Amino acid sequence: ALTISVEGWDRRGAFCPLLRQISLQPDRLLECRAMTYQVLARKWRPKNFASLVGQEHVVQALSNALDKQRLHHAYLFTGTRGVGKTTLARIVAKALNCETGVTATPCGECSACKQIDAGRFVDLLELDAASNTGIDNMREVIDNAQYAPTAGRFKAYIIDEVHMLSKSAFNAMLKTLEEPPEYLKFVLATTDPQKVPVTVLSRC
């Protein structure tokens, strides 16, 4: 849903703004071939730590952890909307699964990096807690956690707006947060950390 591609003939010029003037002529047809439109925020989203702006202390801490192989099983990213929490989480997923090895400088060229950038990496799960608040949604996530990664080195679970989860969903997640498999990393993101239970905060 991020990209709209338009192919074929367009008599009205609805998707060809530069050619609308010509399209108004009834005796001519316009051909719009593979015109792709993408939201600028998506197009220019940072894809590595070096391209992030304004998060120096966070980047330094994560880079050190990756380079020294001192990785926690769960991270909590907090901040207002649009500061880059989900973007940073995806970069962490790339750093963990880059085919060159666990690194603070993922190559961006290997199959794993490209699939994560495209949102198609099988071992990266992104859950919008605002839309999936219930225990049934969380049970599906936890049930999947028992299986080893299919394509990557680690499974990465990114749970956005985690404070929106129900109390029962938080309780279902606690056991896995306490004793996660070695191959599983949680990245929780929230705009309202005060609403996240203390039992969850203490495990991040």
Where are these regions (language model features)?
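P-loop/Walker A NTP-binding region and its immediately flanking N-terminal helices
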Residues: 7-203
